Amino acid sequence: MSVVSLLGVKIQNNPAPFLAPYQFEITFECLEQLQKDLEWKLTYVGSATSSEYDQELDSLFVGPIPVGVNKFIFEAEAPDLKRIPTSEILGVTVILLTCSYDGREFVRVGYYVNNEYDSEDLSAEPPAKPIIERIRRNILAEKPRVTRFAIKWDSEESAPAEYPPDQPEADILEDDSAAYGAEEAELEAALVRELADAERDVKSEDHEMEGAEPAIKEEEEEDISDAESEDIEDESDDDEEDLDEEEAGDGDEDVEMGDDSEQKDDGPKADSTNQHSHQPEVMVH
């Protein structure tokens, strides 16, 4: 756990002329009393290709540090143009704001800085020799890159572990990279097998469909012939039934005409039986 935590950084003059000093309002919190001072430092990266052109703009010792939230203004001079390659003056570069305790850096804040002319004409056609008075810097304050480091403070208990703990079982395990590659190879081989099986299934289904078409046609023809034969048989049966009904109909008429008196006698009996059958329903109500 860090004893000092950086809470915020505000850039006072931004954008500003290239030769104007840098001004930062820094807010930090101290959790316990410190025996030594904090060292703040601002570094200008003169070239992206080599650290040879990096230059320390200024450094400041702050202390003694009271416990709680603290705030101060850190001001640093502009970089020395003689130490910057002419081709690197314009364009994008980086400044680094760092803080150390007892020579041990525990926080670093990096900002992108864009150096460009204040005129569109000069930006479109920059002169061979840069006009420093017309160059303005713009710090991208909204997108800082903050890096924190674990360090030893005043007590030995606060010191971070210099070496990772012993893990003898880790030496027995296989290399993760080799296992990862083997898993990828297995997955790829399994995928190839699945695709091949799927293609074979599709081809076999196509052959089955081609062989099944004649059989289906034969079954349809058999069904049609069976249906026609059934229709013919049904028609012949219907004709025979019609003839039987006509003959039976004549006999029925003769019987009804001859037994008319018997049907009249049976009528009241049927009504009386119906009345008797309805009486239980009335009694229920």
UniProtKB/Swiss-Prot annotation:
It is found in: Nucleus. Pfam families: ASF1_hist_chap. It comes from Aspergillus oryzae (strain ATCC 42149 / RIB 40) (Yellow koji mold). Interacts with histone H3 and histone H4. This is Histone chaperone asf1. Residues 196-285 are annotated as: Disordered. InterPro entries: ASF1-like, ASF1-like_sf, Hist_deposition_Asf1. GO terms for cellular component: chromosome, telomeric region; cytosol; H3 histone acetyltransferase complex; nucleus. The keyword Coiled coil applies. Its main location: nucleus. Residues 196-210 have a biased composition (Basic and acidic residues). One of its GO terms (molecular function) is acetyltransferase activator activity. It comes from the Eukaryota. Residues 218-263 have a biased composition (Acidic residues). Belongs to the ASF1 family. Histone chaperone that facilitates histone deposition and histone exchange and removal during nucleosome assembly and disassembly. Keywords: Chaperone, Chromatin regulator, Coiled coil, Nucleus, Transcription, Transcription regulation. Residues 183-248 form a coiled coil. The gene is asf1. GO terms for biological process: cellular response to stress; DNA replication-dependent chromatin assembly; nucleosome assembly; nucleosome disassembly; positive regulation of transcription elongation by RNA polymerase II; protein modification process; silent mating-type cassette heterochromatin formation; subtelomeric heterochromatin formation.
